[in-house]
């Protein structure tokens, strides 16, 4: 296979859901085209459609419907070739599959081989929601794009660092070893990007806290630009509540639910049917804020618990670091929600943080400091997880 060793590499980034497939094609860090296959109901039957999104933001619905999602990879390859994005002169250099899975193996990035599938089988029990889709995506990619390296991108790699001070659980060593347990963390691609972007923007401080607030939510504390503490653990369920996750709860509740519902259903309940959705009936923070403003008690309770969770974790990490010099907000809620940022920072004035009349981020600047002049900085910095994964995949291929 021809490779782009000395020119911009071309990568296909996969996002395999339980009933959807997204294919994002990148030339270097620039997304040139994406395809999104999703299911719809039509005359009582499930059909699958595909939307093409081009670099200029224009969208086109493919004039075709399919009976199964299994055709997505074959159809995606045909569409990319027809559009001229992939051909003999512009071959794919690699296919990237993000893996949200625990264990030492998945704390690093790997070119897929037989060992990868063995390791996926090991973590299926602790991650029944993500692993099946990931496994399906990898198998379809290797079959459809024969000869192209498929790379599993760890969602904890950037957090796997000797600077971490919170990787252990207080469990018997033999149990930890047998089940390969640890506080691996998640959202690593976002934090990895931030660890490069913050100093690049000249914003690095001694003690910083980065709040990744999106559909999933986590917080990581950085000391000298390296991870010291992170809120997620063996799985993304530990830590903050989020759109559909409980966040940390009494483990006995998890055990009880597992006994009553079965382990897989209990894990699904705590990951997909809890959090903001369970409390407020919506997993959309905008709807929850609107509901709280209209005196909807459930929405107000959900919003308050969410804010208290973030503030509490910031306080915990600040205490562990002996202070905090700057706070960063990123991901969808962190970047876009002025009410969320305001509610959080209003509780942190005792730490030296105050917001001015918060402004929406001017993306042309690359970041915004939304703090008062006499406050420690509060930055809003857009994340770019794909850019980080592409960088790390390129390094892996160059060094193989």
Predicted regions and their residues:
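Glycine-rich phosphate-binding loop of actin/hexokinase-like ATP-binding domains
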Residues: 158-259
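Glycine-rich phosphate-binding loops at beta-strand->alpha-helix junctions
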Residues: 325-348
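Short beta-strand-loop/turn "lid" adjacent to the catalytic site in phosphate-handling enzymes
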Residues: 80-130, 149-151, 157-168
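Short glycine-rich, Thr/Ser-proximal phosphate-binding strand/loop in the N-terminal lobe
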Residues: 19-67
